[in-house]
C-alpha cells in the first residue's frame, strides 16, 4: 500500500521513510485548511490524489520526464479508475484539481525543507513560497508504515462515510 511507498525516492532524514500515504494525509489537511467547509467528497479526492502510485510508485520528476508522455497517460487512467471506485467523478472539476495541486505544493515545500535537506530559498524556487497561514502548526511526521496505513485507511473511511 501507499504507506510503504517512499516519497523523495527514499532520500529523507529520519528513522522512517516518508510515505505517499503520509504525504496524502498532509495534503488533505492543507486542502481542508485552505477550503474550510468544502464537501467531504473533495477532501476524499485530496487524500486520494496520489493513489495511482500504489501501482506506478512515486517517481521523481526527472524520471517522469524521461519516461515521456506515456507516464502521464497511465497516471490519468489510473486516477480515473481510483476516482470511480470511490464514487468520485473520473475527472475532477478544474477548480478542485487546482486547489488540490496548491495543497500538494505546500506539502512538497514542507517536505523539502523539513526532511529532504533543501534550503528554504531552493524550495521557494521549486514549489513557491507557501502562505504563512498554511504553514502554521504543520509538521512532518515520520511514523512506522503500519501506523500510517491505519491512519490513511481510517481517514478514507471517515471521508467516504461523510459522502453518503
Which residues are covered by each model-predicted region?
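Metal-dependent phosphohydrolase cores
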Residues: 1-164
Amino acid at each position: 500500500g501507499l504507506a510503504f511507498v517512499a516519497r523523495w525516492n527514499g532520500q529523507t532524514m529520519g528513522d522512517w521513510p516518508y510515505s505517499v500515504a503520509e504525504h496524502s494525509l498532509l495534503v488533505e489537511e492543507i486542502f481542508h485548511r485552505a477550503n474550510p467547509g468544502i464537501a467531504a467528497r473533495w477532501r476524499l479526492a485530496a487524500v486520494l490524489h496520489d493513489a495511482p502510485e500504489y501501482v506506478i510508485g512515486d517517481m521523481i520528476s526527472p524520471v517522469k520526464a524521461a519516461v515521456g508522455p506515456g507516464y502521464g497517460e497511465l497516471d490519468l487512467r489510473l486516477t480515473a479508475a481510483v476516482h470511480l471506485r470511490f464514487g468520485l467523478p473520473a475527472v475532477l472539476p478544474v477548480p478542485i484539481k487546482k486547489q488540490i495541486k496548491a495543497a500538494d505544493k505546500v506539502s512538497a515545500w514542507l517536505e523539502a525543507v523539513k526532511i529532504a535537506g533543501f534550503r528554504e530559498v531552493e524550495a521557494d524556487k521549486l514549489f513557491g513560497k507557501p502562505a504563512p497561514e498554511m504553514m502554521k502548526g504543520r509538521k512532518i511526521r515520520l511514523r512506522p508504515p503500519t501506523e500510517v496505513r491505519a491512519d490513511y485507511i481510517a481517514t478514507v473511511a471517515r471521508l467516504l462515510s461523510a459522502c453518503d
